[in-house]
Each structure stands twice: as C-alpha cells, then as structure tokens.
Design a protein with these regions (language model features):
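A short helix-turn-beta junction within AAA+ P-loop NTPase domains corresponding to the substrate/partner-engaging
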Residues: 1-7
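Conserved AAA+ ATPase "sensor/coupling" helix adjacent to the nucleotide-binding pocket
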Residues: 12-21, 66-70
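Amphipathic alpha-helical "lid/sensor" segments that cap RecA-like P-loop NTPase cores
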Residues: 22-63
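Accessory nucleic acid-recognition modules appended to NTPase machines
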Residues: 50-213
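Active-site ExK catalytic segment of metal-dependent nucleases
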Residues: 213-224
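Mg2+/Mn2+-dependent nuclease catalytic core
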Residues: 222-242
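Short, hydrophobic beta-strand segments that form beta-sheet elements in well-ordered domains
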Residues: 244-252
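Domain-level recognition of nuclease-like catalytic cores that cleave nucleotide substrates
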Residues: 253-274
Length: 274
C-alpha cells in the first residue's frame, strides 16, 4: 500500500472533494492549509487517518518493523541485524541530505557497531527495494561527478518520519522537502538534485520522460528568513542560467508570489497538481 496523494488525502477525509483549480476563496484556502498540515504530520497511509496520534505512531512504527522483517531480513542474509537497524535509523534522521556509505560507516563506528561499506551499500539497496527509501543523485552525465557527490535519500512518507523520530529531531524544512519529492515521484519523472558551478544547489531537477520537458523546483519553508530565502532563490536563478530551464518554482509552506520570472507557490496549492 502506497501513501495517498494530497488530492486522494482530501477525498479520503471528505475535504473539498472537488477542490477548485483556479481561484480560491478565503475559506477554501484555510481548509487547504489545515489539510496540508494534517497531511504533512499524519502522512498518507489510509489506515492511520482516523486514529489517535499515539495509535498512529504505533501503527506506523509497526509498519516499518514489518517491512524490515518481511522484505529485508526474511529475504536476505544480513551480516548484522544491529547494523541494519542503525542504518535505517540514520536514514530516518538524515533524509533529504547527502548520505554515503562512508558517512554511515563512520556513525556506526562511533557507536561501536561493526559494518563495512559493502554491507551498508547492500542495506541501502534492500531498503530501496522495499520502497522505504528513494535515492536521488546529482544531475550529471559524469560518473566522476556522481562519485564525489553522494546521493540524497527520501522516505516514502512524512508520517513515517514523524513516527520514527523524536519531536526535537524533526525539522519542518526537511519534512516539506520530503513531501515535495514524494509528489514529484508520482509523475513520469526522472529526479535529480542540481549542483551549480559555484557549489550552490537546487533541490530538484525534474525531467518528465513522457513530455520530454524539464523543470527546476526549490523548496523553502517561507520567505521571512531573508538570508536563507536569498540563498535558495539565488541558487535557482544560477541553475536557470546554467541549464536554460525556464520552468522554475519555489515551493513554500504558505507564501505566494513571483520574482524575476520564478513562481513562489504554497505547498497546499502546488500539491493539487500532483
């Protein structure tokens, strides 16, 4: 069972069964904002929608355990169950960030957990095959560039992330980025992150394999943090210049506008297209 899309989440919960695609009333905007917050926090698995918060956490943790045992431990010869579990825990706490077998190996070593990099690479492949994680590589045709720029890993559901992490470890910007990735994954898209020549990054370079078109998507929680937003905006402008891609969007939590030909779209509106 895969998580619901935002549109499916709305229908499943009886919220704006036919949300407008154009203008929104103030009431509709309020409803969609609240729904987006619930979607981010609960996630999209149907079975956990109508239960208490504590029951939801228990069910989602049980889901991870079931996948771990059914899809990994029962199918593969695992050299260290402890290392396997610590690797998964690391991914739940470091999603949407560059992650390598070297970095995971270093963390495990500090925890006195033995695991070589080859085994960790196997664990990552098995988690991917079990649809728990999705790797995203740097946009490049060069194997050398890909070797020195590790993949980023996204989780299948933000509700799972919240269930597996203590509250103080949750960072809303990373959650929003994971939510945007999972929406992009639903299309016929090849997704990478884009590295500019100056070292700055754009979260997603998206190539639609059917339409043969490309777009750039940056995720920023809001525009209020001027320094952070300027850094993310400037990176997108640089990528637009380097790639020639004109379809550029910044997805925020609730800010909307346009700047220098770049759309700024709140996630509750952006998700309706996916």
């Amino acid at each position: 069972v895969f998580p619901l899309s935002f549109a499916e989440f709305l229908r499943f919960n009886g919220i704006l069964r036919n949300p407008p695609q154009g203008g929104f009333t103030a009431k509709e905007k309020g409803v969609l904002r609240r729904a987006a917050k619930d979607y981010l926090e609960r996630g999209g698995f149907p079975d956990v929608q109508d239960v208490s918060d504590s029951m939801r956490v228990a069910m989602l943790q049980g889901y991870v355990d079931a996948v771990l045992y059914r899809d990994v431990l029962e199918r593969h010869s695992v050299p260290s169950v402890q290392a396997l579990k610590y690797t998964l825990d690391y991914l739940f706490h470091n999603y949407a960030r560059k992650t390598s077998t070297r970095s995971i190996s270093g963390v495990l070593k500090n925890l006195s957990v033995a695991a070589n990099r080859e085994s960790i690479a196997d664990y990552l492949d098995w988690f991917k095959d079990a649809y728990l994680i999705y790797p995203v590589s740097v946009k490049s045709d060069s194997l050398a560039v890909k070797r020195v720029n590790p993949d980023k890993y996204y989780l299948i559901d933000t509700g799972l992330i919240r269930a597996m992490c203590v509250k103080n470890d949750l960072e809303r910007g990373w959650l929003l980025e994971n939510l945007v990735f999972m929406a992009l994954r639903r299309g016929s898209n090849k997704i990478a992150y884009y590295l500019n020549g100056d070292g700055t990054e754009v979260d997603f370079h998206v190539f639609n394999k059917l339409a043969r078109t490309s777009r750039l998507v940056q995720v920023s929680w809001d525009t209020a943090d001027k320094a952070t937003f300027a850094r993310e905006f400037d990176a997108l402008v640089a990528a637009r210049k380097e790639t020639g891609i004109t379809d550029c969007t910044i997805v925020t939590w609730d800010d909307e506008g346009e700047k220098d030909g770049i759309r700024i779209v709140p996630v509750w509106k952006w998700l309706l297209a996916w």
